[in-house]
Amino acid sequence: MGKIIGIDLGTTNSCVSILEGNTPKVIENSEGTRTTPSIIAYMEDGEILVGAPAKRQAVTNPRNTLYAVKRLIGRKFEEKEVQKDIGLMPYSIVKADNGDAWVGVRDQKLAPPQVSAEVLRKMKKTAEDYLGEPVTEAVITVPAYFNDSQRQATKDAGRIAGLDVKRIINEPTAAALAFGMDKNEKGDRKIAVYDLGGGTFDISIIEIADVDGEKQFEVLSTNGDTFLGGEDFDQRIIDYIIGEFKKDQGVDLSKDVLALQRLKEAAEKAKIELSSSQQTEINLPYITADASGPKHLNLKITRAKLEALVEDLITRTIEPCRTAIKDAGVKVSEIDDVILVGGMTRMPKVQEQVKEFFGKEARKDVNPDEAVAVGAAIQGSVLSGDRKDVLLLDVTPLSLGIETLGGVMTKMITKNTTIPTKHAQVFSTADDNQPAVTIKVYQGEREMATGNKLLGEFNLEGIPPSPRGTPQIEVSFDIDANGILHVGAKDKATGKENRITIKANSGLSEDEIQRMVKDAEANAEEDKKARELADARNQADALVHSTKKAVTEYGDKLEAGEKEKIEAAIKELEDAARGGDKAEIDAKVTALSEVSQKLGEKVYADMQAKAGEQGAAGAAGAGAQQQAQPQDDNVVDAEFKEVNDKK
């Protein structure tokens, strides 16, 4: 059985890890870095770039370079968070036929899971290159506060990337696993995991206990905001720069997509620099131009200014912390350790606020970028049976229920219930002789159903005619270990039942997923062909270069006919290399190799002759030197004794 890899599919960066024995290993990608930007670029020739190569070309291709797509996964186009992003992103966010938020690139509509699958495929390939074997199974992390639709969409992304997703695991829980597994402290510990990433914020209160030699991780509560993260901090800096430039130069950069892409890069860089220095300078020459000529942007930003710009964003993270503590039934003083996860937690002001709330310094021995992937890999080793000393008890982040008479949300499973879990309850009809009931499933905390997220609906039909309130319809909710919901309804009188796995009231259909899997496989085949063609061209270029060099040096030793044949073969190979037929290039490489064989023999013979001359000269020199040394009659033969150090 192959290894189950752990993938942290992040909004801004992604990371992949495996367990070697009991030691977690974060794997470097082909660019040599341990994290990969979650950026995907669609090129004009059909090539898809992922990670650093996509990030490098973003400035010149802003409309077809996608980032922070995780913020759209499993969301409806009409949601206010999505509407807010439409005005900020240089790429287009469009409404799919089923009402979901999709993205538009190069005249095609793409579903967010399809785009995220490109990042997952890169993570899969990174692991395969390191292990030297195919990888088919993974544990993928999601923000703890992701709802059912978002979890389902993440699972779909894994399938499109060719991965069997063994488990969806919450990011703070994964970080707690990574933290807890290498600590030998005995006794129960309560930890708070504060996870502020590129696009989402989570807070989880987790108890780590030793139970009969087994480490038990029990999530007591979780809370968060799936639309708050580093991208929002960047946006505040961008807005500030745009405002200052408008005041200074009278030019509005907010409608210039090329300028916006450069501003985004500069804002992210400034934010990172201000975590370690008090002031930074943003310098962007030729940012735009008007009738008077080119305009340059030069602006200093202090740490204090940045903190003022984002103060309310940091404050927004504290209320969920308060709720999580209350839901866990603990006091702040009972928290033993605070763990910071996500790149944004490197910001001194964030650390300061966390310290102020929890009354203690956060641990510094957890890598905020890698802990989540490491935890996912640990969970993978538990699922594969390699580790038997870990038990993970996670929770559902939001309450689940159905709409009942008067539009009320009747909760079936309350938030922070340990999963997997089941719950059943009996309901009845609202009207006389009602032949069917519609079960509408919602997720959220509001009292009225419409204030919550509709996950899906289905009908139970064939109810025998009877007065209202008489039929007994048992509705059952069953949440699996991935946090994905299965709902059933059964008429106890007739035994008729209907069950659905909540796929969100839209999401991707099975046919769409299969089509995307096929597209991905076709792309992989295209990529393979493109790589083989590039290799063939490289081989052709190298052979042409070395043959031309040899002809220049040794061509006069060849007969005129031989030289002409070689030159003709070089031209044919150069023409073939400009085309796109790999077989043609291979054939011309073979042809040039054959006609230049004589030339190769001449080169080899010449090198042998030169080596022979040098050897003869060297031997003569050494002989002369030997003769020149006078005999010394006073040389004494010394006795020697071998010393053995290994005693």
UniProtKB/Swiss-Prot annotation:
Residues 638-647 have a biased composition (Basic and acidic residues). Residues 611-631 have a biased composition (Low complexity). The keyword ATP-binding applies. It comes from the Bacteria. Induction: By stress conditions e.g. heat shock. CDD domains: ASKHA_NBD_HSP70_DnaK-like (cd10234). Acts as a chaperone. Belongs to the heat shock protein 70 family. This is Chaperone protein DnaK. The gene is dnaK.
